[in-house]
Amino acid sequence: MELVAGSYEQVLFGFTVQRGPAKSGHQETWTPVADFTHHSHTASLSVLASNSRYVVSGSKDETIHIYDMKRKVEHGALVHHAGTVTCLKFHGNQHLISGAEDGHICIWDVKRWKCLKTFKAHRGHVTFLSIHPSGKLALSVGTDKTLRTWNLIEGRSAFIKNIKENAHIVEWSPSGGKYIVVVQNKVDVYRLGTASVSGTITNGKRISSVTFLSDSVLAVAGDEEVVRIFDCDSLECLCEFRAHENRVKDMVSFEVPDHHVLVTASNDGFIKMWTLPQDKKVPPSLLCEAKTGARLTCLTVWLDRAANGMASLPPAAEPCPDQPKTIEKESGDTVQEETSEPNSEKSDVSGDSKQPTKGNSPVTAKKRKMATMSEKKRKKKM
């Protein structure tokens, strides 16, 4: 288990969490040990994401850097976007989706690190995106005051909803039965079946991060030191606790045997791990904390779990016309992309093309056969 945090100071921090056995009369001990610091970006880090092998970081320098956590090396960099990278989401271990201030959303093949599809998603910035647990749909919000639904099977826009203000967070629930949209200090809860707001949660200050603890329980952090836990059905605040000495910037939750864990990162330079009780009305207990000495901006938790081959995005449409060629180096040097000529071969997100190859099209063969029969009839008449 590795806690990974990005900072305004352009540095990436990694801490390995060591779990000690519980002693008589004492709880199990969790100890974060500094593992690495890495300075590869030329501007502050804005977003992090992880799967079972990689951690990826997005920055205001418009690049995405890839880190192989099993080999502990920098794997490469992607330079497709022309604006601050604002959102990164893995779906399983085969695909990554990125969004940026250039208004584009890109789908990447993680095995080859190739851009399979580019959407012109918003007229303004893409501020956040979230993938449905099924992998068939994605939601995005941007600075054009729209909430957009994407059909990832066909690789196209499915629905556009106008909202009154610019939303900066959108997130699916773990089951995919509901989703939330955050505007300033308010969380609108939507039901998937009706696509309408079923209720609104109001926080004290502007919301900076949210994470679902269960299908109906949501942790909310704002521009303050407090984290609040809400019930999305009753809209009731179940509990709140002071997590940091400065505003909380990002949160991640996950489950391991015997523990449901919430991790928080703050401008005060601390990463903290909290264990959540079954009764969410009881505030969580602090497991451990790590001090970085930097102003933290984003957070992810890398869990060394076996790859799940079933988790992958369904097929999408054709690859982006400016298909990038990625040069990979394992030495830890920065790897840039070189744009190659457009690839004429059709592909899909799963990597298996179902399009007929040139010269073997059934339509072309049928036309050729009809032309041959017409030629024979013409010769008989002559």
Swiss-Prot record:
GO terms for biological process: cell population proliferation; negative regulation of signal transduction; regulation of signal transduction by p53 class mediator; ribosomal large subunit biogenesis; roof of mouth development. Its main location: nucleus. It is found in: Nucleus, Nucleolus. The keyword Ribonucleoprotein does not apply. WD repeats lie at residues 37-77, 80-120, 122-160, 202-240, 243-284. Residues 352-363 have a biased composition (Polar residues). It comes from the Eukaryota. Interacts with PAK1. Negatively regulates the PAK1 kinase. PAK1 is a member of the PAK kinase family, which has been shown to play a positive role in the regulation of signaling pathways involving MAPK8 and RELA. PAK1 exists as an inactive homodimer, which is activated by binding of small GTPases such as CDC42 to an N-terminal regulatory domain. PAK1IP1 also binds to the N-terminus of PAK1, and inhibits the specific activation of PAK1 by CDC42. May be involved in ribosomal large subunit assembly. This is p21-activated protein kinase-interacting protein 1. Keywords: Nucleus, Repeat, Ribosome biogenesis, Signal transduction inhibitor, WD repeat. Residues 365-382 have a biased composition (Basic residues). Pfam families: Beta-prop_DCAF4, WD40. The keyword Repeat applies. GO terms for cellular component: nucleolus. Residues 313-382 are annotated as: Disordered.
